[in-house]
Design a protein with these regions (language model features):
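C-terminal helical cap(s) of enzyme catalytic domains, especially alpha/beta-barrels
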Residues: 1, 131-153
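Alpha-helix-loop-beta-strand connector modules within alpha/beta enzyme cores
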Residues: 1-3, 28-34, 83-106, 148-153
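Glycine-rich tight-turn/loop motif centered on a GG-T
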Residues: 1-9, 75-89, 129
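Conserved anion-binding
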Residues: 1-60, 69-72
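Hydrophobic faces of well-ordered beta-strands that scaffold small-molecule active sites
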Residues: 37-41, 65-67, 105-108, 125-128
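Non-membrane alpha-helical structural segments and their capping/turn regions in soluble enzymes
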Residues: 47, 84-92, 112, 136
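Alpha-helical scaffolding segments of alpha/beta enzyme cores, especially the outer helices
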Residues: 52-55, 89-96, 113, 117, ...
Length: 153
């Protein structure tokens, strides 16, 4: 957030990438105001103290929460939890509480088909895949298709 009395942020004018072509401080201020302020809920201790964290986040102007099932599972010394049905109550709690505090939750998906459950829980913001995984998946499909064709030669 911008370092201004009304906003309460701590980001001042700095020589960063936006300054490469020009240095319009008004445009830079607008860029800072447009940034989504997101916190991650990814540790067991964070879920244990979720109300306090979300109350403070709301007071600080946090826009979004990001649920982290992998790190949550690791922090409970249960790495396989992230792939089990037992993760769902924790995930639902984070989503429900985020919405109660007026903070939009964001969920990472591997496919569009996974979105329905989250939409039903009130989620409206998604990250679908990651570039390297999407590329790998498509390249594997292309490669296996070409292998089938060329194996017949």
């Amino acid at each position: 957030r911008p370092d201004q009395p009304i906003v309460g942020g701590d980001m001042g004018v700095k020589l960063r990438r936006p300054a490469l072509s020009s240095y319009d401080t008004e445009a830079y201020l607008q860029d800072l105001k447009s940034i989504v302020f997101c916190i991650m809920i990814e540790k067991s201790i964070a879920v244990d103290h979720l109300d306090a964290i979300l109350a403070r986040a709301r007071d600080r102007g946090v826009d979004m929460t990001q649920w982290g099932p992998a790190d949550f599972s690791f922090s409970r010394a249960e790495p396989s939890l992230q792939h089990s049905e037992a993760i769902k109550p924790f995930e639902a709690l984070v989503i429900q509480k985020s919405l109660e505090y007026g903070i939009q939750p964001r969920i990472e998906l591997g496919s569009v088909e996974q979105a329905k459950r989250y939409i039903d829980l009130g989620v409206r913001h998604f990250c679908i895949g990651w570039d390297r995984f999407i590329l790998r998946q498509q390249l594997m499909l292309l490669g296996s298709g070409m292998r089938k064709l060329t194996d017949l030669l």
